[in-house]
Amino acid sequence: CLALITVSYDEKPGIQAISNTAPDLRPTSEHGEVYRDAEYKRLGTLSLLAGIDLLTGEAIPLVSETHKSSDFIEFLKILDKKYPSQDTIRIILDNHSAHTSKETRRFLDTMPKGRFKFVFTPKHGSWLNMIESFFSKMTRQMLRGIRVNTKQELEERIYKYFDEVNREPVV
């Protein structure tokens, strides 16, 4: 092991893609606010799997239709490609079943010994994981009240948010 990379990781499932049924009314001289009809159309949900490199502050996203072991494995593959092969990647995460499933263990068995090290947060201790505050900020800044025309548009906007955040990472 040349370096020890530490990544704070979690999932944010059930991000709703919601579209308007009528166009928003723009502000005018009489009213300075955007008016939005209370009616909306649900287009489905997406799941976000994400990590923050605790040394560099870089946020690493994976948007998925599902929230399963295969998605978690896909995220591990992203980390594996991102960091030099001789480094150990320590991941701080919760006790979600996908993190210890047979499928995940089979994948980890194919990796060099010591490539991934999992550090589990205590039960009811998710607030100890830095990614949770990132998700909270993302919800306030970007997801709350968002309207899109398709799930694809929501996915694109999530990835764009990560690109913007990573221009000036906070560590």
Regions found by a protein language model. Name each.
Residues E132-V171:
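C-terminal anion-handling pockets and recognition modules
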Residues L46, D94-N95, F118-R140, Q152-L154:
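RNase H-like two-metal-ion nuclease catalytic core shared by retroviral integrases
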Residues C1-S70, E74-K77:
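Extended, low-complexity cationic-aromatic segments
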Residues V34-Y40, T110-M130, I146-V148:
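RNase H-like polynucleotidyl transferase catalytic core
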Residues S70-R90:
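Short, basic/hydrophobic alpha-helical segments
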Residues D87-H99:
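Acidic/histidine-rich, metal-coordinating catalytic segments
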Residues A3-L4, T56, D87-T88, K113-K117:
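Short glycine-/polar-rich loops that comprise or flank the Walker A/P-loop
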Residues K102-M111:
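Short, aromatic/basic amphipathic alpha-helical patches
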